[in-house]
A protein has these predicted regions:
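A short helix->loop->beta-strand "cap" motif at the edges of active sites that frequently abuts
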Residues: 223-226
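Non-catalytic positions within long, well-ordered alpha-helices that form the structural scaffold/packing
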Residues: 170, 221, 257-258
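Catalytic His-Asp segment of secreted/periplasmic serine-dependent ester chemistry enzymes
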Residues: 152-153, 187, 195, 232-316
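Surface-exposed amphipathic alpha-helices with a cationic face
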Residues: 213-221
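N-terminal secretory targeting modules
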Residues: 1-108, 113-114, 127-131, 310-316
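Conserved SGNH/GDSL esterase-like catalytic core that processes O-acyl groups on lipids
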Residues: 1-28, 94, 101-212, 238-241, ...
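General small-molecule cofactor/ligand-binding pocket signal
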Residues: 136-138, 228, 266
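A cross-domain feature marking catalytic cores of carbohydrate-active enzymes
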Residues: 181, 231-232
Length: 316
């Protein structure tokens, strides 16, 4: 609605130049936020702007539009000159001044977390939580824990988790992080005879992956966060599936299920796998690529998160 449009400023200025690789925070804005309502943030680029980074978010609560011209003051877009998109540029956080008892749960991961389960978790929080918890997604498709690509072909996959994680958990009001990350470390390496940018030497051992997850734990603890981890999902049928990858996934999952170094395991794998054939998704839970879950499976993943995580309780 036109009456809800609030311009943002940066040190009092209507526009801002963001240095490459840097973060900027806008001035505070007087804008009422109601629990469970959507917020639209409009950006205008007066000149051609080459997008070198961004993230694709495809959950049901997420999305936006491209449009021609300066539409920032318009409450409605012309459907003939606009296009729906799931790509998010520049915006990483919206901080809200709220009551002290309110808290934030961070969902950290890759393309699986960039898709629907955090959205369904937010919906579940609104339905059965105590109204104090916000769910924040920190996800980048294609990312790995231990390595990142240094070539134009795969630069869009972004930074490795060991670089991303310390920065991305700096979220206002956060007290818990739920990590579901690591499957790309397992499925990406194929050998330089197949893909020059994906050597077999990139395939980690289970011990190396676990040490990467331990880095997450140490970093989160240093920021005062509780740490929950989700198991890695089935991959049988994915184009690079092999016994060596399944063995690695199984070993990492076994550690996640049994370690006493975290506050709890959310067993996403068992929630969506075929109980008769646990290396594959259960019927109706595969999106079709044998790597990403279906929307039904994402909803099931959200159900697997303990209800205690959706409430502000002293002990989870």
């Amino acid at each position: 609605l036109p009456e809800t449009l609030v311009p943002l400023t940066f040190s009092g200025n209507a526009g801002v130049t963001i240095p490459a690789g840097e973060r900027l925070q806008s001035d505070a804005a007087a804008f009422p936020v109601e629990k469970g309502t959507a917020i639209a943030v409009s950006l205008y680029f007066a000149e051609f702007t080459e997008m070198r980074s961004g993230v694709v978010i495809t959950g049901p609560l997420s999305g936006g539009y491209f449009a021609v011209g300066d539409q920032t003051a318009n409450a409605v877009l012309d459907t003939d000159t606009s296009k729906k998109t799931h790509t998010v540029y520049f915006l990483s956080d919206i901080d809200v001044l709220t009551a002290a008892e309110n808290r934030t749960l961070i969902c950290f991961g890759d393309s699986i977390t960039a898709q629907a389960w955090p959205d369904y978790l937010m919906e579940r929080t609104l339905q059965c939580g105590d109204g104090t918890t916000a769910v924040i997604r920190k996800a980048a498709s294609g990312t790995r824990i231990l390595r990142q690509y240094d070539n134009i072909t795969y630069d869009s996959y972004g930074l490795k988790g060991e670089t991303r994680f310390p920065r991305e958990i700096q979220v206002a009001g956060a007290d818990t992080v739920l990590i579901q990350h690591g499957i790309n470390d397992i499925i990406h390496p194929v050998g330089t005879d197949v893909n020059r940018f994906r050597p077999w030497s990139d395939l980690p051992t289970a011990a190396e992956m676990i040490e990467g997850l331990r880095f997450y734990i140490r970093t989160a603890r240093a920021s005062g966060l509780r740490v929950y981890m989700g198991t890695l999902l089935p991959i049988e049928g994915w184009r690079t599936y092999a016994d060596i990858r399944e063995k690695l996934r199984s070993e990492v999952n076994q550690w996640i299920r049994t370690t006493d170094e975290i506050d709890g395991c959310v067993d996403f794998d068992r929630a969506v796998c075929d109980p008769e054939h646990p290396t594959a998704f259960a019927a109706g839970y595969d999106s079709g690529d044998h790597l990403h879950p279906s929307l039904t499976a994402y909803a099931r993943m959200a159900e697997e998160v303990p209800e205690a995580l959706l409430r502000n309780e002293e002990s989870h």
